[in-house]
């Protein structure tokens, strides 16, 4: 899939880029695999904002993705379409199974219409096939990885991301995450071979504020530009500094430069931390 640029007919158009959607083969989703998507605008049941910068955007229907594929072991599935999914950065592939059922999966790099994919221990090491980690050779590029057997894939699902199977020791496999972290995962957990498709997503430039609003992203206002009643950094005459020894959140918690990982319970599964300067996944 390539990147489309526009003639500079306006300041926004000058730098705006979009995907050319060359890999997309079907315009409308499979209706039986969609559900209504009720959105909250970042509010909880009391109407209070619990997630900032969220709301508005184009109306969407949720595409039901099969992140498990365990009940289709050994059943061949033919790829009949590659579709755009507004709810995620990756594209999705529509599968027609030999038993007549239809399902969506994430579309990896190299998967095209007409290909056949399998799931199960005996599946080949080919993009789109889903296998337990114990049946995948060390060094294989993978995505869509489970963290608990049977729960379904939870990590390495964004466009262009991939992990790598680094080693197998006893009950655990070591998987290198996109962040550089090497993590232990039970060898019974499943993963899909290959890299998640739509790899050009990270170089797309939104170009204008209005396009962010189409995507359901509301503006992010600096605390320094607020009043003291709204943010600890607010107030002052002119362009004064934020005035705190360390930058803080709107609720007074220290922010910026601090580790965001607080799940000590799973620290024992981290073999090595993320590389310096890497973006969190």
UniProtKB/Swiss-Prot annotation:
Gene Ontology cellular-component terms for this entry are: large ribosomal subunit
Could you tell me where the Basic residues compositional bias lies? 45-59
The family database entries (Gene3D superfamilies) matched by this protein are listed as: 2.30.30.30, Nucleic acid-binding proteins, Ribosomal protein L2, domain 3
The source's domain of life comes to Bacteria
Q: Which cysteines are joined by disulfide bonds?
A: none
Composition bias type Basic and acidic residues, residue spans: 27-38
Which GO MF terms are attached to this record? rRNA binding; structural constituent of ribosome; transferase activity
Instruction: List, in alphabetical order, the GO biological process terms annotated in this UniProt record.
Output: cytoplasmic translation
Disordered: region residues: 27-59, 225-281
Q: Which UniProt keywords apply?
A: Ribonucleoprotein, Ribosomal protein, RNA-binding, rRNA-binding
A Pfam family hit: Ribosomal_L2_C
Subunit: Part of the 50S ribosomal subunit. Forms a bridge to the 30S subunit in the 70S ribosome.
Belongs to which family?
A: Belongs to the universal ribosomal protein uL2 family.
Summary of the function given for this chain in its UniProt record: One of the primary rRNA binding proteins. Required for association of the 30S and 50S subunits to form the 70S ribosome, for tRNA binding and peptide bond formation. It has been suggested to have peptidyltransferase activity; this is somewhat controversial. Makes several contacts with the 16S rRNA in the 70S ribosome.
NCBIfam families per the record? rplB_bact
Record-given protein name: Large ribosomal subunit protein uL2
Organism of derivation? Myxococcus xanthus (strain DK1622)
């Amino acid at each position: 899939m390539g990147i489309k640029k526009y003639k500079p007919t306006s300041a926004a158009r000058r730098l705006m880029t979009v995907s050319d959607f060359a890999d997309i083969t079907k315009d409308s989703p499979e209706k039986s695999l969609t559900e209504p998507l009720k959105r909250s605008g970042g509010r909880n049941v009391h109407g209070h904002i619990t997630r900032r910068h969220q709301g508005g955007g184009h109306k969407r229907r949720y595409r039901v993705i099969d992140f498990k594929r365990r009940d289709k072991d050994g059943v061949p599935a033919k790829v009949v379409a590659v579709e755009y999914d507004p709810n995620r950065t990756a594209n999705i592939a529509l599968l027609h199974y030999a038993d007549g059922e239809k399902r969506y999966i994430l579309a990896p790099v190299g998967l095209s219409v007409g290909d056949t994919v399998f799931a199960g221990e005996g599946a080949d090491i080919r993009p789109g096939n889903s296998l337990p980690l114990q049946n995948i050779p060390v060094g294989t590029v993978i995505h869509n990885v489970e963290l608990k057997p049977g729960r379904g894939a939870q990590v390495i699902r964004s466009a262009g991301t991939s992990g790598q199977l680094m080693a197998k020791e006893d009950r655990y496999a070591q998987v290198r995450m996109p962040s550089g972290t090497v993590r232990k995962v039970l060898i019974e957990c499943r993963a899909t071979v290959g890299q998640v498709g739509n790899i050009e997503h990270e170089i797309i430039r939104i170009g204008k504020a209005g396009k962010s609003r189409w995507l359901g992203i509301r503006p992010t206002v600096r605390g320094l530009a607020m009043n003291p009643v709204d943010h600890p950094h607010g107030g002052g005459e002119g362009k004064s500094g934020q005035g705190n020894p360390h930058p803080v959140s709107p609720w007074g918690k220290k922010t910026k430069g601090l580790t965001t990982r607080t799940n000590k319970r799973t620290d024992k599964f981290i073999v090595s931390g993320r590389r310096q300067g890497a973006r969190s996944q």
